[in-house]
């Protein structure tokens, strides 16, 4: 959220934890230890570019793009518990409007975006994916403590549930991210479209 706001975009952060929301709105990092988060967060909050809330549906209704980064827990047998992800998806669906891009960045089992969340978003919003809203999976490729560095260092991978979704996902991430120049990659560092298979 801070990265997107630092590019001049108005960003809403939604969280179920009221203390996290309070800290963010005060410009105080809720998770100490992230390099440069303290100064970057204070800057974007003071400029009015980042606001946090517990009301996900209301800020989704005001947004052109929704990026989902919610923990997915896995038990000892490797079975994922989708409880938090499902709850977030239902809240997003309540506020979803035509033309919105929804991007899941949480690491998910293959096919989850298309086979689980697309239907939940459609059912909860009355909208149709690919026609009324766009849906992509774009796994976060960052390590705690160096998020801003990793966002610049690694290509942003985007896979859409359809061609139009992939196109919108690529366009979105090109607007909100910066990339380091790297000669060791097979093509220019940036947003890489994985297609829509």
Roles of regions detected by a PLM:
Residues 1-197:
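Structural/interface elements that position substrates and couple domains in central-metabolism enzymes
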């Amino acid at each position: 959220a801070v990265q997107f706001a630092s590019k001049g975009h108005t960003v809403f952060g939604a969280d179920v934890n009221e203390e996290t929301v309070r800290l963010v709105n005060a410009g105080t990092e809720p998770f100490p230890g992230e390099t440069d988060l303290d100064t970057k967060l204070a800057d974007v909050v003071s400029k009015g570019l980042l606001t946090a809330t517990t009301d996900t549906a209301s800020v989704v209704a005001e947004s052109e793009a929704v990026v989902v980064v919610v923990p997915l827990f896995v038990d000892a047998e490797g079975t994922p518990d989708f409880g938090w992800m499902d709850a977030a998806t239902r809240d997003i669906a309540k506020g979803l409007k035509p033309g919105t891009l929804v991007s899941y960045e949480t690491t998910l089992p293959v096919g989850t975006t298309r086979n689980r969340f697309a239907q939940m978003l459609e059912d909860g919003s009355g909208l149709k994916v690919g026609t009324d809203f766009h849906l992509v999976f774009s796994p976060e490729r960052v390590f705690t403590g160096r998020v801003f560095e990793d966002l610049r260092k690694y290509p942003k991978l985007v896979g859409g549930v359809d061609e139009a979704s992939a196109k919108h996902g690529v366009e979105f991430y090109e607007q909100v991210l910066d990339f380091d120049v790297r000669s060791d990659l097979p093509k220019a560092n940036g947003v890489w479209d994985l297609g829509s298979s």
